[in-house]
Design a protein with these regions (language model features):
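Class I SAM-dependent methyltransferase SAM/SAH-binding core
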Residues: 60, 66-110
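A short glycine-rich, Lys/Arg-flanked "PGG" loop and its adjoining helix->strand segment in the class I
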Residues: 135-147
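Conserved class I S-adenosyl-L-methionine
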Residues: 1-54, 152-176
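Acceptor-substrate binding/catalytic loop of class I
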Residues: 182-197
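Conserved S-adenosyl-L-methionine
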Residues: 208-219
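A conserved beta-strand element that flanks and buttresses the S-adenosyl-L-methionine
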Residues: 121
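Core SAM-dependent methyltransferase catalytic element
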Residues: 221-236
Length: 236
């Protein structure tokens, strides 16, 4: 699952017992060699889809980590790309990989921008926000988008109990809940609650019109539905 250049189990254990910020600072040099990074096939599919959906002058990669989404912004035709993350270590890696982008250290729940972006993307970050934080998060995104601007992110179809991935995700969430019950500081990383119906409702309340685009090149489920969709929320 990990490459030879990835973190050791000992390094992962230290990271998992840290705060979210400190954990990612520690993981940053080897993050791109872990399965936690969004796969290139997903990034490429999103970039191609966005390139056909609009013209974007400025773009923001929300919770950019090591900057994989900054490349997506370029592929979507964004003229000026900005990445924001609260891990200084992750931003250092992002700056080296995308030297033409502006990388800003900030909290996603208190974005230091006005209405300056045409497009906001995010990859693999929503598990770090509890459901009660979604309204504030989506409101922050809405406030940094120009009217008509888009907030886009991939969302895999939910896995059924007959799949290995379903039980792996259930086990991971359970392990994180036990960890946070007995250890401080907490490390928030729960991905199962982020479901389309709830997310669509909160985006609508925050001021977005929501559409779901199939990322067909990522394959289909046995019932013919797409394995992954692209949520595109347009600011009203």
């Amino acid at each position: 699952m990990f490459t030879d250049q990835g973190p050791t189990l000992c390094e992962l254990a230290v990271q998992a017992l840290s705060s979210v910020e400190r954990g990612y600072d520690l993981l940053a040099p080897k993050f791109d060699q872990t399965p936690f990074r969004t796969p290139d096939v997903v990034l490429d599919a999103v970039g191609r889809a966005l390139a056909g959906l609009g013209l974007y002058g400025t773009g923001l990669d929300l919770c950019c980590g090591t900057g994989a989404g900054l490349r997506v912004l370029r592929e979507a035709g964004v003229g000026r790309a900005v990445g924001v993350d609260f891990s200084g270590g992750m931003l250092d890696v992002a700056r080296r990989g995308e030297p033409t982008a502006d990388c800003v250290r900030a909290d996603a729940l208190a974005l230091p921008f006005g209405e300056v972006f045409d497009l906001v993307v995010s990859f693999g970050a929503f598990g770090h926000f509890l459901p009660r934080e979604w309204p504030r998060l989506f409101s922050e995104v809405c406030q940094v988008l120009r009217p008509g601007g888009q907030f886009a992110f991939p969302l895999p179809a939910p896995m059924g109990p007959g799949s290995l991935g379903y039980w792996a995700m259930l086990g991971f969430d359970g392990a994180m809940r036990v960890r946070n019950a007995v250890w401080r500081p907490p490390f928030v990383m729960y991905y199962r609650p982020f479901r389309l119906g709830d997310v669509r409702r909160e985006l609508d309340r925050a001021g977005f019109d929501v559409a779901l685009h199939a990322l067909s090149e990522l394959g289909e489920r046995p019932d013919g539905s797409p394995r992954c969709g692209l949520v595109v929320a347009t600011r009203r």
